[in-house]
């Protein structure tokens, strides 16, 4: 059975991120907050392991600098007293060229006393790179990978 308080905390966290409300997002988080986004940090240096609430303001600022419009829909949330998970679809418009990118993410949370202690996020970074570049790299990448697997 879903824990309504935990679910609301997760929804507030996600809504606050995409609306840029740092203070509201921080209220959802424990002082020991940690976030880990599984993505290549060489390409996305603002992802990876981040510790502390200071990351929240930085992440929102980076997103707002890069994207003129950020929208999201929460497709699914399941939560109990100590854990929660959500599926989110984000649609963002790049400032540099007005290209619209769509990102599907899996968001996972650990909670303590009704606040988020740990946040983990997964998404298809290869797909995002292709969208950001506006170029389908699948065939080129597949050919290179096929050759590498033969060696």
Task: Show the residue positions of the predicted features.
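A solvent-exposed, acidic/Ser-Thr-rich amphipathic alpha-helical stretch
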Residues: 24, 30-82
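Short, mixed-charge, low-aromatic patches
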Residues: 11-20, 43-47, 63-66, 87, ...
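Short, low-complexity N-terminal intrinsically disordered segments enriched in polar/charged residues
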Residues: 1-27, 31, 139-151
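General secondary-structure edge motif
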Residues: 5-6, 36, 43, 89
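Hydrophobic pocket/interface hotspot
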Residues: 10-13, 24-25, 29, 33, ...
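A beta-strand edge to alpha-helix "cap/lid" segment located at domain peripheries
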Residues: 2-5, 64-151
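Proteins with a high burden of low-complexity, intrinsically disordered sequence enriched in S/T/G/P/A and R
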Residues: 14-17, 25, 41-42, 52-56, ...
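Hydrophobic alpha-helical core bundles mediating ligand binding, dimerization, or RNAP-core interactions
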Residues: 10, 14-17, 29, 37, ...
